[in-house]
From Swiss-Prot:
UniProt name for this protein: DNA translocase FtsK
UniProt similarity note: Belongs to the FtsK/SpoIIIE/SftA family.
Residue ranges annotated for the FtsK domain, each copy included: 441-653
GO MF entries: ATP binding; DNA binding
Entry-linked CDD domains: TrwB_TraG_TraD_VirD4
Region (Disordered), start-end ranges: 715-735
Amino acid sequence: MKKSTPAPSAVPLWRQQLHYRLKEGALIAFGALCLYLMMALLTYDQSDPGWSHTSSNAGQVQNAAGWAGAFCADILFMILGYFAYIFPLLLAIKTWQVFRHRHEPWQWSGWLFSWRLIGLVFLILAGAALAHIHFHFSAGFPGSAGGVLGEVLGDLAKRALNIQGSTLLFIALFLFGLTVFTDLSWFKVMDVTGKITLDLFELFQGAANRWWTARAERKQMVAQLREVDMRVNDVVAPVAPDRREQAKARERIIEREVSLSKHMTEREKHVPAVIAPAPSKPAEPSKRVLKEKQAPLFVDSAVEGTLPPISILDPAEKKQLNYSPESLAAVGHLLEIKLKEFGVEVSVDSIHPGPVITRYEIQPAAGVKVSRISNLAKDLARSLAVTSVRVVEVIPGKTTVGIEIPNEDRQIVRFSEVLSTPEYDNAKSPVTLALGHDIGGKPVITDLAKMPHLLVAGTTGSGKSVGVNAMILSILFKSGPEDAKLIMIDPKMLELSIYEGIPHLLCPVVTDMKDAANALRWSVAEMERRYKLMAKMGVRNLSGFNQKVKEAQDAGEPLADPLYKRESIHDEAPLLTKLPTIVVVVDEFADMMMIVGKKVEELIARIAQKARAAGIHLILATQRPSVDVITGLIKANIPTRMAFQVSSKIDSRTIIDQGGAEQLLGHGDMLYMPPGTSLPIRVHGAFVSDEEVHRVVEAWKLRGSPDYNDDILAGVEEPGSGFDGGSSEGGEDSESDALYDEAVKFVLESRRASISAVQRKLKIGYNRAARMIEAMEMAGVVTSMNTNGSREVLAPGPVRD
């Protein structure tokens, strides 16, 4: 049913401006205070008047901050000692944090402020105590090295724990206070430190490998030059007067010719590599393509209730062979030579050309480790003059090692080419995904329901957004809105907003991250509701539920909703209908994690753990594959991954738990890890342009309009779900609802105070109608619920002319 979405209440502009001005004023005040205190501390002179002593030279102050600065410095040194120098730095750190979040709305929290203040107190006490224990104070300063606080705490701790125990205690308190005061995550510090260490190690290792390679090449060149000199001296020797010397020279030449002929015979006996046939165009299109080529009999019926034709996509270009068997064999022989230069004996077993890359399957000699070949990937790329070389260590069912080398002329894999295949047409799942072609040019078709969730990551320009569009269009070409529904979350407000208005959407494209959290909460509540329905029906998954509902409808005995709560004996439970598969697409997962934070991670983990049987699936995409975004909790529950080109091996390991994604070519080149395996498949993603997406969206708009559910973005709890919806902060008064007056008018005219009646009349959700009835009860319009579940209308009816 069609529902209207009320406009969210916005914060008044004057309040926003006031918050920003107050925040700017606080920044200026704190910055000036930090500079003033540091200037006072650095120019402290004991001859100046202060709090701890008097001075006969009161008229002249040496401190650059003046009389007040001298007093402030004396107080800080007297109380904190050397730690007084750190105190302005702590204020500066907090000022910097406020500056970083200056564009966010100001939200005061007394509990959070108290927690930060406790952290500052721990910092000051622990720092002063450590200064007193480990430093000696100068005679030109008042008090001790740790001030009064440090002296008292340090002496007490030394008597109880000795110096070592006291140091350990105060260091722990100092780190705890620093974490609480500045929100510093030590796990993130360790991750960054480890990443820098690994990058430096790889840098030094690469430099060492280059040096050893250059050294070996120089040695080989010197040896070759010496051999040439020896040949010249042997062959072009001066005429010897002795006949015996001439005979020996002839024998040496004959021996060299015999050895050369033997070497040529061995090369001729070498078995050439088997070159696999090139990927040709599909032998025959799918039945759907042939059916769409037939002209429809009635123009009006060609749109209503049908899927968009694949012909609205750009057709695939005619494939032409851009190589020859001789060139492939030459590259294979060159590969053997280059690996032999690095001390690795191999032989090319087979060659598999593809649209983007060519895989050379090599057979290593006995005793050669695969790791030696993997470590030579960059050196091979340099030797072969290509952008990157990827080494496939394990090929299932074979004893060979794969070396993937990019082609000189790269072919474009069109999206229409993948959709026209029988593999896509014969797939029965409503959430079938057409990814692209594998290295051999065969289509890669997968089922999102079997994944059941997908994690996509890749840097900017790697083809990640095009891949997400291809997945969405795969669903739009496969199923109608009665079979699949979409919830799209687009923090960047650019990628997914193009799909606004298609009938598959359950709610408008979400760009506000607070609404994104509400959408995920609704998904969890819907998951719980579906599980309760399936438990009542005695089925185990969504397909079994839909089958049972369909059989009941075909038999003329539709099933009633067993979870419906009746308010009176006159209420009738609504009939069960087919439940569609729901796909939640998040384009930039990192932005949502940064803004909403931990609660989104928990919601996603809960959906990923349980939502498979309920027919709710996630597609999470991010261009920042770091461990603070793709956490262990998310990775553990989403085993299916898709890695586009990334910048480092660490990012590749974060996504697919192994290297390789950093050696991809970009522009849709990906490593796809199917469910149930740890061996990624290299896939060349299908290209879909923005114009094609627009054409598909317009075609679906002609076939229907969206049926939005207002409860999704309102963050409302579903009845009987057992899950706290956690709506927006503070909540809203139901009387401010845009439809509240219309609901009161309906109740007064019909004299029926029923939630279900209001729900059917206004075409809204159950929870919204219940809130309106409760608001009428608070306002005295209707009575509270009687024993039989009914209510009486107290207010008089409207006056009629």
